[in-house]
């Protein structure tokens, strides 16, 4: 048997909708003499009892012209539906696959040229990659109520017409017109049949009346004959004229009798016709009753299917409820296990914390004893005192041991002094490894020192290539590159690979006044300079012999007296006599971007320093204070603390690479060392009082263990 369409669907999702679609396709535009407009296969109506279910379905698929897919999440997950699609596509064109979405989502990915299976919950996996372009699908997600699943419902009838149009080989509008014509023909035929029946009934009644009239005429004729015979017998004696008249009258009567007989025969023929029409009417009525019986049977099947669908939904809901209960119980057990595991971890963590606390207290006690012994041995055996202080700091590297070690160092003769400049020493710099110290003076000289023996630093070289006073110096992290800034507005780049024989690589020009500040990034690729001309400049020194100026910063309104770069070179800080410091983004070094302006000092900002990670900024000012700033959000710096230990201008600040130690130098002839473990509450560790003049410069080695300070004439180097 050939089918016009095969319906593939999920019983759980569309047990009621699938029969309604089948009935609609079979009835829409049906001719009066045919039981169905289309032959539609659906598993519950098209299959007989068989031992080979899939084989029967395959036969139906092969004999079907169109494949109607009722797409839903349940159908997408059904192995039967996917198997039916795969078999259909192996033997038919995808053009004859008609998708009808009954629930879920059907989403087309225009970029991929395929159905979006991630967002399409109603699309079976078997349809991946089969469509050459976006298919037109019918949306029946609204059709759920019983009254919506009937051709008398306008929207449902319209949807069925759209689905059936292609199967009939005509447009939807033509199919609508055809259905209207068929409906009107059926009404006309019903009315005609009723009229014929009524006419037949009237004809039968008329024939019966005619037959009765004919019988009356025959009777009357017989009476007339009898009377005629009597008259003839009685009046035989009448004249020939009367006899002729009688014969003539007899002929007339015989003619009337013949007409009556013909009328009777015609009445009998009409009665036979009426009886035949009555039989046809009875057969038509029987066919009508049979059709009503078929309709009633279809309705009963539909009701049974709906009841079965409701039962299946009930079973599915019950299974879902059981699954939900099982999932809830599994989740409860998981939470119990997780809680027990958390308690076990907490107990283990508490035990570990108590053990660590015991070890910590033991280290603190040992460290305190060692610091006490160091204090006792400070005068009689300085070397032993320092060793004890170092041991105490190693055992417990806390603020107390750090302060004790610093105090021991500054109170012994192991703080070294270097001399040699004939004018004010304006700057000092230490390499990251603490092996190279550079000092500069207003006498125009720059000296290179080896501070390995901090008690007796050794001078390695003296740079005298400039006759102008040198105001500032900076060393790269590896100690191989030195930059100096001079009164004549120039900066110079030096190669210290051989520290005993420094070699000048380049001279930088561009400033129009004293270069008072220089700084190198951690990777040695970026140089920043600041000048009394009110500008700062950014240079590329990747090629040290041929530096390139990248940008000039002109936002300050007074001399730029301090610059500092973060370890990664992405952050620049500048300080100025305009009482402000500024933070710059150097991600694009050729186009620096100002992120923030820091205010708070009441006099010129003469010193800035950045920690290695760029999160901490220190500023020093002529107002006698130093300030700490949090640059975690560089666009919104936050002031952490104000350091007020000095009694005069703060000329210089230096931060260790880890940002935990700060050194400051002041006009009050002292340098101070601060513990920044808690940046919001800095703690002064030591005050260094060995200088007899203003401390113009301080420098910390990368590991924070060596501090160099410079006063107007002397330089000191001490261990930390």
UniProtKB/Swiss-Prot annotation:
Q: Which residues form the TIR domain?
A: 1-131
Q: What processes does the entry annotate via GO biological process terms? A: NAD catabolic process; signal transduction
The GO molecular function terms of this record are: NAD+ nucleosidase activity; NAD+ nucleosidase activity, cyclic ADP-ribose generating
EC number(s)? 3.2.2.6
Segments annotated as WD repeats? 420-459, 465-504, 510-549, 555-594, 600-639, 645-684, 690-720
TM ranges are 192-211
A cellular-component GO term for this protein: plasma membrane
Renumbered residue ranges of the record's region Disordered: 231-275, 292-359
User: Active-site residues?
Assistant: 84
Q: Subcellular location, in the record's words?
A: Cell membrane
Keywords assigned by UniProt, alphabetized: Cell membrane, Coiled coil, Hydrolase, Membrane, NAD, Repeat, Transmembrane, Transmembrane helix, WD repeat
What sort of enzyme, by top EC class, is this? hydrolase
Q: Which residues form a coiled coil?
A: 313-362
User: What does the record give as the reaction this protein catalyses?
Assistant: NAD(+) + H2O = ADP-D-ribose + nicotinamide + H(+)
The annotated regions of Basic and acidic residues compositional bias extend over: 256-268, 307-359
Q: Which InterPro entries match?
A: G-protein_beta_WD-40_rep, TIR_dom, Toll_tir_struct_dom_sf, WD40/YVTN_repeat-like_dom_sf, WD40_repeat_CS, WD40_repeat_dom_sf, WD40_rpt
Q: Which topology term describes how it sits in the membrane?
A: Single-pass membrane protein
The disulfides recorded in the entry are none
Q: What does this protein do?
A: NAD(+) hydrolase (NADase) that catalyzes cleavage of NAD(+) into ADP-D-ribose (ADPR) and nicotinamide.
Which PANTHER family has this protein been placed in?
WD REPEAT DOMAIN 5B, WD40 REPEAT PROTEIN
Q: What is this protein called?
A: NAD(+) hydrolase ApTIR
UniProt lineage: Bacteria, Bacillati, Actinomycetota, Actinomycetes, Micromonosporales
């Amino acid at each position: 048997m050939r089918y016009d369409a095969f319906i593939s669907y999920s019983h759980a999702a569309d047990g009621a909708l699938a029969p309604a679609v089948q009935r609609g396709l079979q009835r829409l535009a049906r001719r009066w003499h045919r039981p169905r407009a289309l032959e539609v296969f659906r598993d519950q109506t098209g299959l007989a009892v068989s031992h080979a279910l899939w084989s029967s379905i395959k036969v139906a698929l092969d004999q079907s012209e169109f494949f109607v897919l009722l797409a839903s999440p349940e159908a997408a997950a059904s192995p039967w539906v996917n198997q039916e699609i795969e078999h259909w596509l192996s033997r038919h064109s995808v053009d004859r696959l008609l998708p009808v979405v009954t629930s879920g989502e059907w989403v087309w990915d225009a970029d991929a040229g395929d159905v979006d299976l991630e967002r399409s919950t109603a699309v079976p996996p078997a349809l991946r990659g089969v469509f050459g372009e976006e298919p037109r699908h019918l949306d029946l997600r609204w059709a759920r109520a019983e009254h919506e699943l009937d051709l008398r419902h306008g929207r449902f009838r319209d949807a069925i017409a759209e689905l059936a149009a292609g199967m009939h080989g005509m447009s939807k509008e033509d199919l609508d017109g055809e259905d209207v014509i068929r409906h009107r023909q059926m009404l006309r035929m019903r009315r005609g049949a009723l009229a014929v029946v009524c006419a037949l009934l009237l004809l039968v009644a008329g024939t019966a009346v005619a037959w009765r009239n004919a019988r009356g005429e025959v009777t009357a004729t017989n009476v007339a004959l009898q009377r005629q015979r009597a008259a003839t017998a009685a009046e035989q004696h009448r004249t020939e004229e009367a006899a002729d008249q009688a014969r003539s009258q007899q002929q007339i009567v015989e003619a009337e009798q013949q007409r009556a007989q013909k009328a009777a025969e015609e009445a009998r023929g009409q009665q036979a016709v009426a009886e035949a029409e009555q039989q046809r009417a009875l057969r038509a009525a029987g066919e009508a009753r049979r059709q009503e019986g078929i309709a009633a049977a279809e309705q009963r099947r539909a009701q049974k299917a709906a009841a079965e669908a409701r039962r299946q939904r009930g079973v599915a809901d019950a299974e879902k409820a059981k699954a939900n209960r099982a999932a809830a119980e599994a989740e409860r057990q998981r939470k119990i296990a997780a809680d027990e595991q958390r308690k076990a971890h907490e107990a283990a963590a508490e035990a570990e914390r108590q053990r660590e606390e015991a070890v910590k207290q033991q280290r603190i006690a040992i460290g305190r004893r060692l610091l006490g012994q160091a204090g006792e041995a400070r005068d009689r055996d300085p070397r032993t005192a320092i060793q004890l202080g170092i041991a105490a700091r190693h055992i417990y590297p806390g603020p107390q041991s750090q302060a004790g070690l610093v105090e021991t160092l500054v109170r012994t003769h192991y703080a070294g002094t270097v001399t040699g400049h004939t004018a004010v020493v304006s700057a000092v710099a230490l390499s990251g490894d603490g092996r190279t110290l550079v000092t500069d003076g207003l006498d125009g000289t720059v000296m290179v020192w080896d501070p390995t023996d901090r008690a007796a630093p050794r001078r390695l070289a003296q740079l005298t290539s400039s006759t102008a006073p040198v105001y500032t110096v900076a060393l790269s992290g590896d100690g191989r590159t030195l930059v100096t800034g001079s009164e004549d507005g120039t900066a110079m780049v030096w190669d210290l690979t051989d520290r005993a024989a420094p070699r000048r690589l380049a001279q930088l020009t561009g400033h129009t006044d004293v270069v008072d500040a220089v700084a190198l990034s951690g990777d040695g690729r970026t140089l920043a300079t600041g000048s009394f001309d009110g500008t700062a400049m950014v240079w590329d020194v990747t090629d040290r012999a041929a530096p390139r100026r990248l940008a000039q910063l002109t936002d300050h309104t007074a001399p730029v007296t301090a610059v500092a770069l973060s370890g990664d070179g992405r952050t620049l800080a500048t300080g100025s006599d305009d009482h402000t410091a500024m933070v710059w983004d150097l991600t694009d070094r050729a186009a620096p971007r100002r992120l923030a302006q820091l205010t708070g000092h009441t006099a010129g900002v003469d010193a800035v320093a950045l920690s290695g990670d760029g999160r901490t900024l220190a500023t020093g000012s002529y107002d006698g204070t130093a300030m700490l700033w949090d640059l975690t959000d560089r666009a919104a710096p936050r002031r952490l603390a104000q350091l007020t230990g000095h009694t005069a201008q703060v000329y210089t600040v230096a931060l260790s690479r880890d940002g935990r130690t700060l050194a400051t130098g002041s006009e009050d002839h002292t340098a101070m060392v601060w513990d920044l473990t808690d940046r919001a509450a800095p703690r002064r560790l030591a005050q260094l009082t060995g200088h007899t003049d203003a401390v113009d410069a301080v420098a910390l080695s990368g590991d924070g263990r060596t501090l160099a300070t410079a006063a107007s004439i002397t330089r000191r180097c001490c261990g930390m």
